[in-house]
């Protein structure tokens, strides 16, 4: 953790909010035009994806706030808890990279790898919480830290869910464009 990195996350989230507003306004205006069936599907899919990307940025702020609270209260995870959260963080970085790369490059093969990773992250989330409860019962972790761990895990899980949504929108759009024709 560093203040510079935390501020960078906050600055980027503020930019994402501005981009979200502008892109959503543009796509909404565009959707009111006389679009082809294909273009209409693409605009709708983009609107959903943009919303999910914006929500991911909101969760990044929540993560920063949790880490800042840990520093302020001088709380640290146990060695095992830190290892688990580092693994969880690496999985989240992986799913974010896959999702953004798939979206930017319209890479369907990469998009197909997101959902299986999201399911692994779901299991990792359950394991982290279960292991934390064991440490709590053994007195190896505090209740305050447990609440922060729960907040971090929830935000990580939601980031993974939004990544999954984006990948699914991409795959559904491709399927609709391949297998559906507009009504006469």
Predicted feature residues:
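Cytosolic, long alpha-helical scaffolding segments
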Residues: 1-181
